[in-house]
């Protein structure tokens, strides 16, 4: 067999490996991967062809570029690991000329769901290139975050391509075997304490600190050691020397120091927007600037949780230091490096006045001192016309919600689906009854409303759930509400700032958690446009089961990872499930960089207590 060698030498700090063998040189370890692939299987798809390869567990799916079979491998290693070399050996390269071009990956669905076939299957400039695509036989991405044991680790995602495509010749180049050898050395420099002085860090403006003492006492009564720190103490350097160019960066550096000095795992940010015409904040926010669908900036609380980059250094989200964070302008490329894996479990209580904070604190205490009914309420309909995307008139909302039910087999289920009933606040309220642990709504959204369609009825909206419906929710048990849709957790709106819906003093998600005598204990949704993936493009999540794209990618997949973390990974705390969703989505869709996937990762926000024991403590 003819062997072609590729050798890359570098010194990088890596994430996520499985140790396969130990190198002969002291202190060095190896990861060895040996994968066999079948001859490409060709199938006709109208005027295009599709490729499949046995041994490839997913596909490279970049809009406007050929869909290429791909094998992904994820590994975990200790924080600070140095990669010394990566060597790839491939078998003899064979070629095959195709009758038709390989089908391009579909363009992202527009938020309104209305696209024509020409827009969806637009071929990018790669189809006029003479270069092979992908540009090499393998690629990788690295990141730093928390593993399932709450330990700081680094993650490596390898992508191996058994097929490469020359569009000008309409010819594929393929291999039947690839061997990768990664030599690395674990670092002796571990910045984290062996034992945690505090589990939970509460950061707050001074004006809210007195009220939060009751929450600190409650948390410590259940063994969650808690430190309450005010923003003034951060800015004055009372605990650590002040670092950072502006207030959000000073806070982020403080969180980094708290991790390394106190062993913090959970971070609760307290404070939302200050009431008024001009936008001011009790607790600062970070706007990021990934352009997509006419949205040029939006809030991402993930900024405060993504502390370390792939080198184990501070991750600023502003690589060029120009003060524009997460920069990817409409006609440019990604400027700033972002790791995207959370390094703490983080949530926010977006209270605007003391009265609202009291409501949230009392609800948390009542919730954790109770044991909730194992019940979930689900609602969804037909979100998109999926036929142009290769679908079969699937009802995406129901598919995603039904998948959620699979992860919670011992839960009572109450479904509000079309056509069995109208999707309305009244029917959702009836399904909720006295309460539940979870509520999952999957459809379309705005800051003040969630809704969807009946089957094939895309010109008419269901009544759904509107902010003016919330005063009538008097459930005694408060669910964690996951709201799938655009801007469903946009918490910066006001009567003078509401670009994606009707003016309102506050949004749907944060109104749910400040509702007195009902509503939610926490919400998860999006501060921006997430990406939707109707139709069928192959096994996008690489689990070996080809399902509709709405459960394998996009905002449906993000929400399902949250429920998978709770139901299948036995994660007990709310912030752990949020972290699992973000990290798992990042594993699959960070590379290659896509504006829409970064939007989805950035925007998925937890409004609630990350240290919340899901379902309560009491038996």
Segments (PLM) and residue ranges:
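Cysteine-dependent hydrolase recognition
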Residues: 23-619
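N-terminal signal peptide
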Residues: 15-23
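Bacterial N-terminal signal peptides
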Residues: 8-16
